[in-house]
Structure formats: structure tokens, C-alpha cells
Amino acid sequence: MMQNSRRAGATSVSFDYVEATRLLTVRDNGCGIDSLATLLTVAESGWNADIIEREQPYGVGFLSALFSCEFIHVESNGWCFSAATKDLLSFKPVTIKPVVDWNGITTITLQGFKPEAQQIENHLQRLAKGFPISVILNSVPLERTRAVDAGLQFANTEIGQVYLNGLSNEENWLHLCPYFHLYLQGLPVYHSDEERYFGHIVHLDSARFHARLPDRDKLIDEADVVAEVKRVLQREGRQKLEQLKQQLQPPAFAEGYETLKAYRCLDLLNDVPVLPKQVLAFVQDFPIMEGCDAFNLGTYEQPVTQEDVLTGKVNIAELDDFDSVGAARWMFAWHRDLLIYRSRLDAGHWLLDHLVDLNAQAVRIEIIGETHRASFQGQWVEAEAVFCEQYRLTIGDACVVIENDALYDEDGCLFIVPKGDASGAVVGQASSYHDEWDSFNESIKEADEWAFQNFVIANTSVDPAQALQRLLPSFNSCPALFAKRFQLELNESGQIAAVVEIR
């Protein structure tokens, strides 16, 4: 009915519904129905040749209304008829009568209308969003926020009229919008995601695109149409972004990385002498295995220019995730204050020729000032530990000497503990503490960290008694040992050889 009103040249179509009597009245101020007899003929359109060629009406719109009510009255162009819908559907004869003093308003009244009031409201609100003429429900105009005349900036294209959300005048182009909505003859026919999400709007050319009968709510060859729409959106978006590049300063344009990426226009950054912050990260703390989480890297917020990179003021490295390449490369990057290249740029971007590839180069670990070795056994990790003054990491021609942070060498299954680290954080480099169900076991990790901390203190203490006390477990669960004194004897390998109670 809305489509018929639009085709009739109406400026508005109104719906009035009285729930108590289930009476729906539809009115419009269009040119009216030329022939009520044609209206009652299945699959015969009463529209002129121009509309038939442009929009291909098939004469089934009115027929569908007959299935939704019990009785119908139609009044238009000085003629009217009334009939039970079951009689019309049975093709019984209908008497068409003249109307005295017709007021110029086409009126269709449906009695015994089947849908509920809320259904009617929800349905009309959805249909009105992109409709080209005013839609009124119970004297209240419905929102038409996606209509061509809604104040949005539409561009004429080969597929129809296109509005690019975020890339129109005075809109925030940094606001990334992945959704789009397709309308045909003002009615919705496709949504890339939920309809409630605002996004790009395309009013398809009805001479090129068609919808399936009888409801016309689905496109014919939908997959092909959607693919073409995506190509046009990408092309139109690129044109807008090229214009923005000419208008904005390099730092401001680089801020649009996510938008450029969404439109497949990252190549527009190739000659911009400022790096987007989205492509850079830094190792923000002692690096450990991440498992299902990602927390080793933080976004580098400071601006980095092409000059910073070319002069060596800033060094940027390629580095795969911790779980793939291990601790040594990450410790090297952390202690060398390297920035990490973490997101993709176009293959022709100037930065790619100046990256330090930490993944491809071998890393050499040198232990300096080794004192002794001991075996650590926690709940989830166990390995030999080497205690030393410091250790050196070398990649290519660059090296770093570390004396305050322990390292787990997964190749040698070895904890390297320099004199400046008495914490247990290094166990996190040997295990992510995620089980086979990807659940993080915080209590086990904390227990292993505490045990390793005691293990380090015990192995670096100059007082043997203090070292022993650190290594002894808790005896809270054994009351028989409370308030007792014991003498322990250890053998040459550190195993308990004898325990004697002192009375």
C-alpha cells in the first residue's frame, strides 16, 4: 500500500488503527486509482507504461492485503466498493458504485485486521526509515532517517544513490562503519548486519535491480548485488579518502588508519611521513607467555615520523608473538626499547625497508659470571636454573647485557637467573598457566612464583640455615609435627639423607 501511494504521487500516506475494533484505515493524497476493476484483477497492473517499465509492478500488492483482513472498503477517484475478503478471494462479483462529493483522498479501510497494534507499529517504523514520502501512524509522522531527503549526502552512482557514513561532509571520518543497508523503491531489502546499526545507505536503481515477489523484501541474485555494492562502496570511499588526504596534514591523515584499512586504501599512507599509532606497539612490562590473552604489548601513543626512523632515533622491529618465538627475542626487544611493528601496512610503504627482523635472525645467549646451577620443580614448571652475575643477548650486530631480569631459555630448558632478580616472575615465560580448556590457573601460577622466589633466595643466600628455611614447605597440615625440633642431614646431591627428632 505504501508503494501504491508513492507511485500515485502522494506526498504522504497515513495509517490509522483502532485496536478495539481492529480497524485499519489507509489514506493518501495521490492521483487515485484509475480503475477499481483493475485493482481486483490478479497479476494485472493499473499503472501507466512509464511506471511499469521503471518499477515493474505486478498487481499483487492489493491482493496481499486481502489475506490480512475480513472486510475491505476502497474509495478512490469518485468510485468505491465494499466486500468481504473471502468473497473477493473466491472471485465473486463486486459492485463498484460512484461516490458523491469525493474529497480527493484515496481511502482503504480494512476491518478485522489480523496483526496486533505493536506489530503494525514495528513494521511501519522499519518500512518508513528509507521511504521517500511521509508515513504517518495514528497522526504521528514516523522517522525516515535513511530516506534520500533525510538530509544525508547521497551520491549518484551506477547502482543508485549512495550515502557513505562517516565520509560525508562534516562527519567524523575516523568513525569506522562496517555496516550497510540496501533499499529498493524506498523499502529495505538487505542489511549487512542488524538493521538497528546505522551505516552506509544505498537506494538501489529500480531499473537495474529487482526483488522477489510477492513481498519484495529480498533481492533477486542477492549475492551478486551485494558484491557489486561492496565494490561501489569501496570505490566511492577511496575517492573521498583521496580528497581528505589533500585537505589534511600528515599526522591527521595517519589517524585514519582503521578507516583506510576498512576501505582497502592503506596504499594512501605509503608516502605519508608519519606512522599511524595503530601499527606500532611497545613491550610494556616483563614479557611472559600469553596463552589466550594479549597483554605484553601496549599501543605506542607518541608520534613517529619518517625522519625519526631514517636517523635511527626510533628503531622498529618485526617480532612474532611470544608463544611462537620465545622469551629471548622479547627480552632483547624490551631491554633495547625497540618498537614493535604489529599491524599491516601496504607492501609499498616506506617503513618496510627499515624494519629490524627479530624473527629471522638467530639469538645468542651468553652467561656471564656463572656461580652454580640447581634444579627447580614447581607445580607446572620444572627446569634447571643457572645463577650468574648477568647474561648477554645478541641478535645480528646488536647486543644487550641484562642483570636485573631472569630469562627462560626454552631451547635449553634453562632458567637464567642474574644477581639482580629475586622474583619468581620468570616462571611465566615457561608456562602460560592455561589448561587444556584454556582456563587460566592463577593460584597455581602464584604458587610457582612464590616457590621460585624462595628457590632463588635460598640459592643466593650466604646463610645456609636461612636458605634451608626458605626451601622448607609448610607443615600446617601435620599437627603431630607442631612444636617439635628435628635435625636434617643432606647428602652430596642435596637429597635428605636422614631426619632425627631432637628431644
Predicted regions and their residues:
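Flexible ATP-lid and adjacent glycine-rich G1/G2 motifs of the Bergerat
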Residues: C31-V94
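GHKL/Histidine-kinase-like ATPase module
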Residues: Q118-G237, L260-K313, E318-D321, G326-A327, ...
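Charge-rich (often acidic), low-complexity intrinsically disordered regions concentrated
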Residues: T21, C31, S35-L39, G46, ...
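Flexible, glycine-/charge-rich segments associated with ATP-binding catalytic modules
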Residues: I72-V74, S90-L137, L142-T145
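Short beta-strand-loop-beta element adjacent to the nucleotide/active-site pocket used for signaling
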Residues: V18-L24
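Conserved active-site aspartate in kinases
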Residues: D28
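Short, surface-exposed charged micro-motifs
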Residues: S12-D16, F71, Q125
